[in-house]
Amino acid sequence: MSTGTADATDHRISEPPSSIKEFLSYMGPAWVFTASQIGGGEVLSVPLGGAYLGMEGIWLIPLITFTKIFGQYYLVRYGVMTGDTFLDALYEKGWWLKWIFYYVFLGGIIYAIGLSGHLGETAGALNTLVPASTEVWMLLTVLAGLAIVGLRSYGLIEKLATSLLWVFLILIAFVSLQTAGVWAPNLASGLVPSMPGRVDGLGVGGMAFILTMFGWIGAGFGPTVSYVWFAKDKVMGMFEPLDDGVEIDKYDLTDEEIDRLKGWGDIVLWQNLLSSVILAVFSFFMWTAAAATLHVRGIQPSGFTVIPEMAAIFTTQFGQWSAVLFLLTTVAALFSTLIGPLYGMSRLWEDAFALHGLFDNYNITRDTTFRLTILLFSAIPLALNLFIEAPLILFALSGALFAPAIGLMYLSVMYMSFDIDIDSLSPVRKWAVALAVFAGVVMIASGLWEARSSIETIVGLL
């Protein structure tokens, strides 16, 4: 570890993990990201694919999860290599890139609007388990989230999210494998690429369904942005000397420190690859569980009724215990989606305010700003659920306003990654660069399509 001096003979950047045990000790940011993402698009959209299409279209899961992850990899890698988050870097650029800084910053509010759907789903699942009222469960869920995130402890978030991740992975695997006799015979044909049929629960089919799935699963806006701050608070790569209070410049790096940074970049790659495997496995089990319960009975739910419909069938087919396991899985996944991005997006706002001189010019601390931000991001979805009670409209509104953001972030960070003056710190894996650019372009296209369909959904529901 760094000693806090800038002596070039004393390496200020630790060696990257060299054993599996050491690597796993730094997997925390990826665990938190994965837990946060699974409770988003995977819980809400993947079961609809299984319900409407059966095993047809399940080939999309590995395609999407193993493609989108590379754009995210370069978002995190940029910070680990430079000590600046991509948001810091965007702020220093000309307005042709700087506007993305404010787009991402305002995305915190838009993301909070979208969280209203997740909060409503969490409360609904809890109310099915222990009947009280959805309003009571929403209040309790928000209070629990505030109590945890308000401590401003990344270590606590990491431990809790990691525990929730493995709980719902084990539970959904168990639940899905109980129905393997139904879906396994059609698995091979489902893995062969084909044009999917129509999914009325999402209002799309064919290529539109593929674009929608690209937008919803694999790496959502909140978890993706938050991952950068998870890595920062884990103190990886160039974030280490900055955390130690050492003034460091990339031109002052020793050859050994550059080699270590490249090693940290590889660690970020392996983090993302492992995360994509877990996302694919979870999505696979959610899809197959829906195919084996809803599809075989011809039940075609909408986006916000799929979970209770599946729970009811599990009760009928296997008994109440299986429905309880499934609902516990859903609650764990959804709650992890609430706390992870709530922490990460609040850290983003905290750093954004710092760039604008808030803490230098006013008598307010980072801790206070962070806690005020989490209050805002919690109050928005709670108020919208309590007073509007239209989660589908709110979820669609969030998608319409912020759909292309992830693709823009991917492409902008790719440009900035090659703008690093030290060539050895620039990306060298051409195949990974190609996949990241592909993911960025597809995400913009799918985002614009999602915005169009979201607007149509809103108009239809008003």
Residue locations for each model-derived region?
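Membrane-interface "cap" regions at the ends of multi-pass membrane proteins
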Residues: M1-E42, M236-D244, D249-K250, E256-L269, ...
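Flexible loop linkers connecting adjacent transmembrane helices
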Residues: T5-R12, V46-L48, Y73-W96, G124-L126, ...
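Transmembrane-helix boundary/entry motifs in multi-pass membrane transporters
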Residues: P17-I20, G54, V80-I109, T128-T134, ...
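Extracellular loop-to-transmembrane helix junctions
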Residues: K21, L48-Y73, D88-E92, W96-I100, ...
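Hydrophobic transmembrane alpha-helices that form the core helical bundles
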Residues: W99-V130, L334-F353, I444
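Loop-to-transmembrane helix boundary motifs in multi-pass membrane proteins
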Residues: T134-L140, W321, F353-L386, A436
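C-terminal membrane-solvent junction of multi-pass transporters and transport-like membrane proteins
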Residues: S163, R347, N361-L372, A396-E450
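Hydrophobic alpha-helical segments and their helix-loop junctions in multi-pass secondary transporters
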Residues: W166-L202, I210-M213, I217-W229, Y410-I422, ...
